[in-house]
Amino acid sequence: MAVQQNKPTRSKRGMRRSHDALTTSTVSVDKASGETHLRHHITADGFYRGRKVIAK
């Protein structure tokens, strides 16, 4: 089992955790339906960039 030789400093701990922050998702509003969706994804109604791409 691996055991550390020395206690990691607060600085090293902070540097390791610097990439752990969560970011908010970027959402867009569809031109045709006004529905919000993730960028580069279709809406739940099947619209993408103002056009109907999936017929339901």
Curated annotation (Swiss-Prot):
Stretch list, region Disordered: 1-34
Record's keyword terms, sorted: Ribonucleoprotein, Ribosomal protein
Annotated source species: Sodalis glossinidius (strain morsitans)
Originating gene: rpmF
Protein name as catalogued: Large ribosomal subunit protein bL32
Pfam families for this protein: Ribosomal_L32p
Highest taxon above the source species: Bacteria
Classification lineage: Bacteria, Pseudomonadati, Pseudomonadota, Gammaproteobacteria, Enterobacterales
NCBIfam families, per database record: rpmF_bact (TIGR01031)
Recorded family membership: Belongs to the bacterial ribosomal protein bL32 family.
UniProt KW Amino-acid biosynthesis keyword: no
Keyword Ribosomal protein: yes
Any one GO molecular-function label of the UniProt entry: structural constituent of ribosome
Entry-linked HAMAP family: Ribosomal_bL32
GO cellular component: large ribosomal subunit
GO biological process, one term: translation
Signal peptide boundaries: none
